[in-house]
Amino acid sequence: MPKKQDNIVNSLAHTKWNCKYHIVFAPKYRRKIFYEEKRLAIRDILRTICGWKGVEIIEGEVCPDHVHLLLSIPPKMSVSYFVGYLKGKSSLMMFQRFGNMKFAYRNREFWCKGYYVDTVGKNTTAIKEYIANQLE
């Protein structure tokens, strides 16, 4: 992904904004599921869904049992709405792509109910490094 400066201000019709969020969420039962093919699949799915909603992925890492994302979400969209949409759509797409997963996850619930979110502010570089070093 191309590097973007930390202090870039985006704009909408009558708004200037710089909203960045560190978001972490995990599969149901914190299962270690993201290896090889499923790791690549969820990465592509999350990129696709973010693109649909105009959300920029600044940094991201798919760990075996959770996902870290540093996102730039426009202020016209609430964080809770977007995370719900992201988890819901990605869940459906994972079950569609990997049909055998429905036996491991009852009621087709792929993700845990909650998530972690933190506003990033001026320490974007530190959060980017933290996410990039998750697998070390």
Model feature map: region roles:
Residues 1-136:
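Basic nucleic-acid-binding interfaces
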